[in-house]
A protein has these predicted regions:
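ATP-dependent carboxylate activation and anion-phosphoryl transfer catalytic cores
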Residues: 1-246, 252-259
C-alpha cells in the first residue's frame, strides 16, 4: 500500500521493528534501493532480486516477472548473513577501518553457502571505500535456526583472510554464544555483551583443510587429454586420467527380478 501510494516503480526495502511477544511491528523507514541484507530474502524465497530490479527498470512488470504478491511463496527455512569487515575493534566495541594487502584470501563454499566478495590474494585495500570485504550467507531449508547458524559459523572458520585485521573473531563469538544460538537476543544484544564477545576464543581454523580438499578435488577432476570427448572416458581404463580409488563408484547393469 505504501509503495502504491507514492507511485514508486522499482525495488525498495522497507524496515520495521518487530515485537514478537506482542506480535506487533513499527515502521522505521523505506529505502529506494537494495539493502546489504537482500541475500537473506533471496535465500529463503529463492529469488534473484538484483535481476528483478534490472528487469523492472527496463520496463518489465511484476505480473510479467511473476512477482505479484500472490506469486510469492512462503519463506523456506532460515538464512543468516554475516558481514566481514576490515576493521579494528577496541575494548568498548568502537571500530575504525583497517587496511593493507591481502597475503591470503580464500572463501568458503558448499551446500547452502554463498560468499559475496571482491577480495583476492594480493589485493591492496583502498581507504576511500567501505570496509566491508565479504558477505557470508548460509541457508537451512529446514525450519531450523540453529542449523543455519552452525553452517555460517563453519563457513567463517573456513574463510581465510591474512594481511589485514577483520571482525572475524567477533562474528564467530556471536554465532557461538549460547543465548544467540537459542534465538534469545534483541537490538541491544551487542552493546550488553560486547566485553564477553570480544574475548579471545579458540575457534577451529578450517581454512587450510578446506583449501587442501579443493585442490585435491581439482586434481582428481583433471583430464589430461586433447580429445574433447575424453571426459566420457574419465574414470575408465584407457581414459586420459585414471586413478584407482575406493571412492570411485562403479555402476554395472544387473537384471532385476520382476516386482
Amino acid at each position: 500500500k505504501l509503495i502504491k501510494e507514492i507511485k514508486y516503480e522499482g525495488l525498495a526495502t522497507i524496515e520495521f521493528l518487530v515485537d514478537f511477544k506482542k506480535a506487533d511491528f513499527r515502521f522505521i523507514e523505506c529505502n529506494a534501493r537494495l539493502q546489504v541484507e537482500h541475500t537473506v530474502t533471496e535465500a529463503v524465497l529463492d529469488l534473484d532480486l538484483v535481476k528483478a530490479q534490472i528487469l523492472i527498470a527496463s520496463g518489465k512488470t511484476l505480473k510479467q516477472l511473476k512477482l505479484e504478491q500472490k506469486d510469492i511463496v512462503e519463506p523456506k527455512g532460515f538464512a543468516v548473513q554475516t558481514r566481514v569487515n576490515m576493521e579494528v575493534i577496541d575494548s568498548k566495541g568502537n571500530t575504525k577501518p583497517s587496511g593493507g594487502k591481502f597475503s591470503a584470501f580464500d572463501l568458503p563454499s558448499g551446500p547452502g553457502v554463498r560468499a559475496d566478495s571482491y577480495g583476492y590474494s594480493g589485493y591492496q585495500t583502498n581507504p576511500s571505500f567501505d570496509s566491508l570485504i565479504a558477505k557470508i550467507i548460509t541457508h537451512s531449508s529446514e525450519d531450523n535456526f540453529k542449523q543455519a547458524l552452525k553452517r555460517n559459523y563453519r563457513s567463517l572458520c573456513e574463510l581465510k583472510i591474512e594481511g589485514v585485521t577483520t571482525n572475524l573473531d567477533l562474528l564467530k563469538n556471536i554465532l557461538s554464544d549460547k543465548s544467540f544460538k537459542n534465538n534469545n537476543f534483541h537490538s541491544q544484544f551487542l552493546d550488553q555483551n560486547i566485553k564477553t564477545l570480544l574475548l579471545k576464543n579458540n575457534h577451529t581454523d578450517l581454512s587450510d583443510i578446506t583449501r587442501s580438499i579443493k585442490k585435491e578435488t581439482l586434481k582428481r577432476g583433471k583430464i589430461e587429454d586433447l580429445d574433447p570427448l575424453a571426459v566420457l572416458d574419465h574414470g575408465k581404463s584407457g581414459g586420459g586420467f585414471v586413478e584407482d580409488s575406493e571412492n570411485i563408484l562403479k555402476l554395472e547393469n544387473e537384471e532385476l527380478e520382476e516386482g
